[in-house]
Amino acid sequence: MAELEAVIEQKLIEQLIYGDSQWIYRNDLKTEEDLWNNFRYILEQNNKERLNGDHLSDSEFEQVKNQLQFSSFYKAGEWLVGENGKVMVHVQRDTERLHLVVMNHEHIAGGSSVYEVINQYRALADEDSRQNRRFDVTLMINGLPLIHIELKNKQHSYMDGFWQIKKYIGEGKFTGIFSAV
């Protein structure tokens, strides 16, 4: 009898968070609003000095969100390469332009990087797709979803997972905070 996909999913998560791993399982992040709030918190924590200890205002965070709306995976990849090892967003605060670090390539596997795992995220139906979808496992770095995994048991080809992701792309599910996946 083939293993249930839910069991495979749980085993993957357990492996990621096992022992001294830096991955943290976040079963509290279930909505897009939850994800944006989590990203905002991490961005503010990693840029306290640049923000002079202040929080981002809602309008400033809207500027950040607008910069994270990538029209293609290629555009997201270009941004993720960063400049001088840093992936940045820019915010206009009064007369000052703030350069906030989203990811620092020098902090891979340590430093200020935060590694989180979510599962069963529910991508809601919208005008492009009339169906809700559930994402199996998503890996996030500094609150930004970057890797999406659709798991399959032995009764299903790994290509089924590939085609499932292609379907989600066609339905516009990798938009908003998921546009960097």
Sequence positions of predicted segments:
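An alpha-helical interface "stripe"
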Residues: 1-181
